[in-house]
Regions:
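Sec-dependent N-terminal signal peptides
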Residues: 2-12
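Short, flexible beta-strand-to-coil junctions
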Residues: 11-14, 31-33, 157-165
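N-terminal module-boundary/linker segments of secreted carbohydrate-active enzymes
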Residues: 15-67, 133
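Short consensus segments that form the blades of beta-propeller domains
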Residues: 17-18, 146, 256-258
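Loop/turn elements at helix/coil->beta-strand transitions in domains of secreted/extracellular proteins
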Residues: 21-26, 146-153, 262-263
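Structured segments of extracytoplasmic/periplasmic soluble domains
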Residues: 33, 49, 53-56, 79-82, ...
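Active-site-proximal segments of metallohydrolase catalytic domains
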Residues: 67-215, 219
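Extracellular hydrolytic enzyme modules, especially secreted metalloproteases
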Residues: 152-154, 158-298
């Protein structure tokens, strides 16, 4: 899985041996002007219709509304509570999905392929940081939300994440990559500019609506042999991005992309285990680092 990850920064009790407590997340659903974007999955808005292409074997079926994302939040909380033995989880009581209407989003006045546009590779880091800024600004402009009371801001965008090495030529290379936007990125491009009321937002994560090629783009699915074999849940992606945000170190080589421990750890390639529905546990080293396990000295 390809993920943009820069230097890690802290969030709540994030020194080694102390990743504990309940993370309160503000999840901002954003959409873009609808249109035909050949390099991007979908039309710019969320999938609100059911798609029965894979019948009762569909992973993360529509509608992708507030209720759907709430269920994903519960799933990720269950995952972290399990792997941390109850030490860490998501505050599912006070974490909030915005806007509050079930099928709604904040419309960003920017074409959606702008944030990962082909031919603009040198601008990708700035533009993905700009997406965090655009989402926060749009949410405050409409609902006057002060996000300073939350531990983490997550932006949910329509379409797939540009996160996989596909076994064929990628037909949608401008999909937005799942990203942890850290404080260094924000300070480099928009220092003190991402404001929500009286609060300055200096980090966040970018999450896709789905990782299921089969249901997200009918034209794309029809051009692929056995599209239902390319289904993945977004649960693993969400768990991985939250892992970065709480300070779990990546376990692959950042410069080359070479895997360190493979599918046996969340913070390497384990986020897509069992098609992303049941991500791999953080490996023993990571659990010790987080304070969720105690090492046995022999």
């Amino acid at each position: 899985m390809k993920v943009i990850i820069l230097l890690l920064s802290s969030l709540i009790s994030l020194s080694a041996d102390q990743i504990q407590g309940r993370l309160k997340i503000a999840l901002l659903r954003v959409s873009f002007p609808e249109g035909d974007y050949p390099g991007f999955t979908g039309s710019g808005n969320f999938l609100f219709d059911a798609n029965d292409l894979c019948s009762n074997k569909t992973i993360d079926p529509g509608p992708h509304d507030k209720n759907f994302f709430q269920s994903q939040l519960v799933a990720v909380n269950n995952y972290f509570e399990n792997v941390s033995y109850g030490a860490f989880g998501i505050d599912t009581t006070y974490s909030t999905i915005f806007p509050k209407n079930n099928q709604d989003s904040y419309l960003i006045d920017q074409r959606m392929n702008y944030y990962n546009e082909l031919g603009k590779e040198n601008d990708h880091e700035k533009r993905i940081t700009e997406l965090l800024k655009d989402a926060v600004v749009a949410a405050y402009a409409r609902d006057s939300i002060d996000l300073g009371s939350f531990d983490l801001v997550a932006v949910i965008h329509p379409g797939l994440g540009q996160d996989f090495d596909l076994p064929f030529l990628d037909p949608t290379p401008e999909d937005i990559p799942s990203t942890y936007v850290d404080e260094n990125m924000v300070n480099m491009y928009f220092k003190d500019e991402i404001r929500s009321g009286n609060s300055i937002i200096n980090k966040g994560i970018i999450l896709p609506e789905s990782q299921n090629i089969a249901i997200m783009d009918e034209a794309l699915a029809s051009a692929i042999n056995s599209p239902c074999d390319l289904q993945f849940s977004v649960t693993g992606t969400w768990a991985l991005m939250i892992g970065f945000a709480i300070g779990l170190p990546p376990l692959w080589e950042l410069d080359s992309g070479a895997s360190g421990v493979g599918i046996f750890a969340l913070m390497d390639q384990g986020s897509n285990n069992l098609r992303g529905i049941v991500p791999s546990r953080p490996n023993p080293w990571t659990r010790i680092y987080a304070g969720w396990e105690k090492p046995t000295i022999i």
